[in-house]
């Protein structure tokens, strides 16, 4: 059985255990003081999957990267408008003298980034539009080299890897 741990603020949906998974949900302010405190505790529980409701600060982002580097599947949310900008947002949280190391860590631990938005549709409702960047060797090299515009071009050309842009 997979152990899934969520850290949320607030918990928006209560998940039930299944025969394949055990799900523990932690709510910031109710069960823990912060995302980073909950994430540090989560690493001691050895979950298979960690969902972080929002990666807001340096400590949470550092711990998320550490969790990914140690074999956990980490899913987290950031408020950004594209996959390329998500990488920049992660790296920019680090002090300038640590950003090169952060790019290296992200380039080796990242599986992919999905950026999503809701757009008005022709029926008056809203539809999901998304961008997907998969961390291929080329994307990893561009992350390490800090080549943002080239990463976007690689996403445009990466449909054989499942990548797509918002356009």
Language-model features, listed with the residues they occupy:
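Short, flexible helix-loop junctions that flank or precede catalytic/ligand sites
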Residues: 1-167
């Amino acid at each position: 059985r997979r152990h899934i741990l969520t850290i949320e603020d607030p918990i928006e949906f209560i998940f039930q255990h299944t025969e394949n998974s055990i799900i523990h949900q932690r709510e910031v302010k109710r069960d823990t003081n912060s995302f980073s405190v909950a994430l540090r505790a989560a690493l001691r529980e050895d979950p298979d999957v960690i969902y972080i409701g929002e990666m807001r600060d340096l400590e949470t982002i550092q711990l998320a990267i550490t969790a990914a580097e140690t074999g956990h599947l980490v899913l987290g949310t950031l408020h950004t408008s594209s996959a390329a900008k998500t990488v920049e947002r992660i790296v920019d949280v680090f002090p300038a003298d640590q950003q090169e190391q952060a790019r290296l860590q992200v380039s080796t631990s990242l599986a992919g980034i999905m950026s999503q938005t809701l757009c008005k549709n022709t029926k008056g409702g809203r539809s999901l539009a998304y961008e997907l960047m998969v961390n291929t060797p080329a994307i990893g090299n561009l992350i390490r080299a800090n080549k943002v515009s080239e990463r976007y071009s690689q996403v445009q050309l990466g449909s054989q890897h499942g990548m797509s842009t918002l356009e």
